[in-house]
């Protein structure tokens, strides 16, 4: 087992973007607490949580910024995108409009961060397959067109949520600064050796 006590702790800011009620908060809640709240409550403004991940070769601290999808909060979002390491753009597979709007969200990220950001396109609510309006193939195609990473999840069922964060962890750059590790909210993960997902860092600009 790796000795994590000597590993540096690097903080990475992840901002979650997307239309209202696509499941941004639910994905974060599933990752943080392995739970799901059936009672919908819209995020007001911006929420913040953080979690330590012990990886195979390093320890990182993920700062998770949950943004509101409502139009009245849109003016707040660019300032949170500006210093982010990762943008997680979420849509609801049962809502075609939320999928179409992801192009705008990705554009917003690139306008603020250029190519210096990892972007992940996430199709959520795969547990509602009988109501699906957006195929997996359409999601994969859009991700290729936008040159971003892609995954489908179900925050309700817990499907692929840990895998989402593994993909992100694999794509993140190496440790460059040392800090004292924080102990609360720890999750241990061994990302796959296959690091091809890191192509999400590339940008056609």
Swiss-Prot record:
List locations, semicolon-separated.
Cell membrane; Cell projection, Dendrite; Perikaryon; Golgi apparatus
Expression tissues: Highly expressed in body wall muscle, intestine, somatic gonad, distal tip cells, vulva, and neurons including AVB, AVD, RIG, and PVC (at protein level). Not expressed in AVA and RMDV neurons.
State the Gene Ontology BP annotations: cortical granule exocytosis; cuticle development; intra-Golgi vesicle-mediated transport; intracellular protein transport; retrograde transport, endosome to Golgi; retrograde vesicle-mediated transport, Golgi to endoplasmic reticulum
Q: What is its main location?
A: membrane
Note the superkingdom of the native organism: Eukaryota
- Could you tell me which residues are lipidated, with the kind given as S-geranylgeranyl cysteine? 203, 205
Membrane topology, as annotated: Lipid-anchor
Annotated residues that bind GTP are located at: 18-25, 43, 66-70, 124-127
| Keyword field | Cell membrane, Cell projection, Cytoplasmic vesicle, Golgi apparatus, GTP-binding, Lipoprotein, Membrane, Methylation, Nucleotide-binding, Prenylation, Protein transport, Transport
Question: Which PROSITE patterns does this UniProt record tie to the protein?
Answer: RAB
Family affiliation: Belongs to the small GTPase superfamily. Rab family.
Task: Briefly state the protein's biological role.
Answer: The small GTPases Rab are key regulators of intracellular membrane trafficking, from the formation of transport vesicles to their fusion with membranes. Rabs cycle between an inactive GDP-bound form and an active GTP-bound form that is able to recruit to membranes different set of downstream effectors directly responsible for vesicle formation, movement, tethering and fusion. In its active GTP-bound form, acts redundantly with rab-6.2 (in its active GTP-bound form) to positively regulate the retrograde trafficking of cargo molecules from endosomes to Golgi structures.
The name of this protein is: Ras-related protein rab-6.1
**Organism name:** Caenorhabditis elegans
């Amino acid at each position: 087992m790796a000795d994590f006590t000597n590993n540096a702790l690097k903080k990475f800011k992840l901002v979650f973007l997307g239309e209202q009620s696509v499941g941004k908060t639910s994905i974060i809640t599933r990752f943080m607490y392995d739970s799901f709240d059936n009672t919908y409550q819209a995020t007001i403004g911006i929420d913040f949580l953080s979690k330590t991940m012990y990886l195979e070769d390093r320890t990182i601290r993920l700062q998770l910024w949950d943004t509101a999808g409502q139009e009245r909060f849109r003016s707040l979002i660019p300032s949170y995108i500006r210093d982010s390491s990762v943008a997680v753009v979420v849509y609801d597979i049962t809502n075609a409009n939320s999928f179409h709007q992801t192009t705008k969200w990705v554009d917003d990220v690139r306008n603020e961060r250029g190519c210096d950001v990892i972007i992940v396109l996430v199709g959520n609510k795969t547990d509602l397959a009988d109501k699906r309006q957006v195929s997996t193939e359409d999601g994969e195609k859009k991700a290729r067109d936008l040159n971003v990473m892609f995954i489908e999840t179900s925050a309700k069922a817990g499907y692929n949520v840990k895998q989402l964060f593994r993909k992100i962890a694999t794509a993140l750059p190496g440790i460059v600064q040392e800090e004292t590790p924080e102990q609360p909210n720890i999750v241990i993960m061994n990302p796959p050796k296959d690091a091809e997902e890191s192509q999400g860092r590339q940008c056609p600009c």
